Every structure is written in structure tokens, then in C-alpha cells.
């Protein structure tokens, strides 16, 4: 299956304006995310942005960039506009939505998100991590996957998602899983998803992936080892600088 990685990036972040161009270990954040995408070897890498400076920074890293409208409500809408521009012939069968604020994501996790699509019945794939921190279980900013295990050829842990929630769920004994917001869509699934109106549960939980579940689409989550650092605040940015500076120095 031919895959393409699309990285949505916008400058108008509420909590950390201008973050795609923030310096992290001598490179812009968008450059760091592009590097992780290229290291994954999954496929063509394209940055989708509404700001020419971000596009220029991406092109400086040797990848394509496409300008999109500034009024998109979600990264899914932004990457779909970009996809129509850069792949009008629909050659890419799998579309990966890699958030532009994940500079520390392991390349192997980008590869992992594609694996659930080996099941022909799966429309959308994503990632999760088993929660080990008790505080995370009750944290509404940590989205939980409510799902059931599915068999895999490699015996990897994978869930069929039945629901996503900010609540502590499911109830009772057993592990809870932290959702990581990277997605791999079958192209036809992305086309269907962006054409759907917002769902009732989506609006209540403020989680756009619930739109797909409400519409009967199948989402599977590959379970990986750790949650990548999402850069949303100045404190997150400083932590990313520490992590990537240490990684650079150890080489």
C-alpha cells in the first residue's frame, strides 16, 4: 500500500503561538517533526500549513509543503485539502496525519500506526499506550481508548476502539490506555470522514475521532511503549529542547 505522511502545522496556536518555528536543539520544531517522518521511511512527507514561513522551513528540509486555508477546524480537514492538491490522481492509498507538534515521536511509532490497516476491515488506525501513572487515569486531558483486543499475526497488542473518552474508563479491574493522536486513514475513509457533520458525542467530548465511530467506521489502535511529548506550552517546549539536545549530544 502506498502511503503519504501529511504534517498539519499552523502558527496560530492559542497556548504557544508560532510553535512550528520554535527552536529545538538547533532546528525548528517543524524540521524536527519532518526528520522523524523521514526516519520512519513510511512514504512521501508533506507539510500542510497556512503560513509561508512554515512552508519555507519545511522545504529547507527537503520535503514538499502545500499552502492551505487558515480557517480549518481540524488537522484532518487541513490534510484533506492538502491531499487533493498534491495527489489529485489518488495514488496514495494510506494517509497518515502526523501532528506538527510531536518532535520526539519515535520513527518506529510512525511505522506502527500503519499496521492495523493490514486488516481490510479497518478504516482508521491510531496508537495507544498502557497507562502506568495513576494521575493520568483521572486526568481529562488524557484521552482514553475504550476497546477490545484483536488478534494480530505478530502477537502485538492491538485494540478495536469502541469509544474514546476524557473520563476514567472502562470501569473495573484491568489496564487503561492513553490515546496518541496520530492517525492512518484509508484514503476513502478520510474522504468519508471529512464529509460527515460533527457528531453528538464528538461535540460533547470534544474528540473528533468519535465522529468516525458514530458513523460506524472501524478504528484500531496499535499499542506502543511510550507517549511522545506533545508541545503545547512553554514548559513542553523546554522539555523537548532538553530531550533532543541530549539525543544530539549522545551521537
From Swiss-Prot:
EC category: transferase
EC number from the UniProt entry: 2.7.7.38
One BP term from GO: CMP-keto-3-deoxy-D-manno-octulosonic acid biosynthetic process
Pfam entry (one): CTP_transf_3
CDD domains reported in the protein's UniProt record: CMP-KDO-Synthetase
Compartments where located: Cytoplasm
InterPro entries (alphabetical): Cytidylyl_trans, KdsB, Nucleotide-diphossugar_trans
A GO molecular-function descriptor: 3-deoxy-manno-octulosonate cytidylyltransferase activity
Alphabetized UniProt keyword annotations: Cytoplasm, Lipopolysaccharide biosynthesis, Nucleotidyltransferase, Transferase
Gene Ontology annotations for the cellular component aspect, listed alphabetically: cytosol
Pathway it works in: Nucleotide-sugar biosynthesis; CMP-3-deoxy-D-manno-octulosonate biosynthesis; CMP-3-deoxy-D-manno-octulosonate from 3-deoxy-D-manno-octulosonate and CTP: step 1/1; Bacterial outer membrane biogenesis; lipopolysaccharide biosynthesis
Reactions it catalyzes: 3-deoxy-alpha-D-manno-oct-2-ulosonate + CTP = CMP-3-deoxy-beta-D-manno-octulosonate + diphosphate
Entry keyword Ribosomal protein: no
Stated role: Activates KDO (a required 8-carbon sugar) for incorporation into bacterial lipopolysaccharide in Gram-negative bacteria.
NCBIfam families: kdsB (TIGR00466), PRK05450.1-1 (NF003948), PRK05450.1-5 (NF003952)
Family: Belongs to the KdsB family.
Protein name: 3-deoxy-manno-octulosonate cytidylyltransferase
Gene: kdsB
